[in-house]
């Protein structure tokens, strides 16, 4: 759904940038002239000059400087800061539109989570399995550490291995919201619980679909919370697997990748 979302930026409780002013800056950049830029933007020269003057006064850096020449007289040039403001404004406008699109595209997405929202409309990875969770515990060994993650369903817990350096850099302390990434080839599927118990993590579920290839099989598994887990296993390990079976997915702590907002 394409919505008209008008972005307004204020500094010191005064208007700094809006669609009209950004349009003016873009036309000045193209024409090299305040008067021509104002004409192309559909506003008067006085209004254009007043807007530029106010933006220059509010900002820590000058946005528009006088220059010789320019189409239509009144030569002007955008500073690097002015150019970056346009880029930032356009980027924020895109983010707003993508955030609004989430309302119609994904009804299940929690909108009270900044990490969930950002990852939904800006983060794309090759990992088929992605879950949101919260750090509940972390040991502090010297080199390799382990964190416990409670997933968004409030029941499922996973153990994840990290380096001590990564734990400190990402601030992976208790209460930190994280995104769990798990690639399909790193997941095993079995009906034998004893086999699954040898791994750090086990997730029970029901096989919902199997795509059999020449060398690999893609197994989709419905988890108790309604989410789908994807695993790719060698053909010889999938001969006994059938749709509708109760199985256990298993994987080790060092197969999991953690992403978060710092």
Curated annotation (Swiss-Prot):
It is found in: Cytoplasm. Residues 125-133 are annotated as: Required for dimer formation and molybdate binding. The keyword Signal does not apply. InterPro entries: Mo/tungstate-bd_C_term_dom, ModE, ModE-bd_N, Molybdate_resp_trans_reg, Mop_domain, Transp-assoc_OB_typ1, WH-like_DNA-bd_sf, WH_DNA-bd_sf. Its main location: cytoplasm. Changing residue 133 to D: Transcription repression by ModE even in the absence of molybdate. GO terms for molecular function: cis-regulatory region sequence-specific DNA binding; molybdenum ion binding. Residues 1-121 are annotated as: I. Residues 33-79 bind DNA. Changing residue 125 to I: Transcription repression by ModE even in the absence of molybdate. The ModE dimer binds two molecules of molybdate (MoO4(2-)) with a Kd of 0.8 uM, which results in major changes in the conformation of the DNA-binding domain and confers high-affinity DNA-binding to the transcription factor. Additionally molybdate binding moves the 2 Mop domains closer together, trapping the ligand between them. Can also bind tungstate. Molybdate is bound at the dimer interface using residues from each monomer. Deletion of the C-terminus (from residues 122 on) results in constitutive repression of modA. Contains two major domains: the N-terminal domain I forms a winged helix-turn-helix motif and interacts with DNA. The C-terminal domain II is the olybdate-binding component and contains a tandem repeat of the Mop domain, each of which forms a beta-barrel. The N-terminal domain plays a major role in the dimerization of the protein whereas the C-terminal domain contributes to the stability of the complex. Homodimer. This is DNA-binding transcriptional dual regulator ModE. It comes from Escherichia coli (strain K12).
């Amino acid at each position: 759904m394409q919505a008209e979302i008008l972005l307004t930026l204020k500094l010191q409780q005064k208007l700094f940038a809006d669609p009209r002013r950004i349009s003016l800056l873009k036309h000045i950049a193209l024409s090299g002239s305040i008067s021509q830029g104002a004409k192309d933007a559909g506003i008067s020269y006085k209004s254009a000059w007043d807007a530029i003057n106010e933006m220059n006064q509010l900002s820590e850096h000058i946005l528009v400087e006088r220059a010789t020449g320019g189409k239509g007289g009144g030569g002007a040039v955008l500073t690097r800061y002015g150019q970056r403001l346009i880029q930032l404004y356009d980027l924020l406008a895109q983010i707003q539109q993508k955030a609004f699109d989430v309302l119609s595209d994904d009804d299940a997405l929690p909108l009270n989570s900044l990490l969930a929202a950002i990852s939904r409309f800006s983060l794309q990875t090759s990992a088929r399995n992605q879950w949101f969770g919260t750090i509940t515990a972390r040991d502090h060994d010297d080199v390799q550490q382990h964190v416990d993650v409670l997933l968004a369903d409030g029941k499922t817990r996973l153990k994840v291995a990290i380096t001590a350096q990564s734990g400190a850099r990402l601030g992976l302390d208790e209460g930190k919201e994280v995104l769990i990434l798990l690639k399909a080839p790193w997941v095993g599927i079995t009906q034998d619980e004893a086999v699954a118990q040898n791994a750090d993590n086990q997730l029970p579920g029901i096989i919902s679909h199997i795509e059999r290839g020449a060398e690999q099989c893609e197994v989709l598994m419905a988890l108790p919370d309604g989410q789908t887990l994807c695993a790719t296993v060698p053909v010889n390990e999938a001969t006994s697997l059938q749709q509708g079976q109760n199985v256990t997915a298993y994987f080790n702590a060092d197969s999991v990748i953690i992403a978060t907002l710092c």
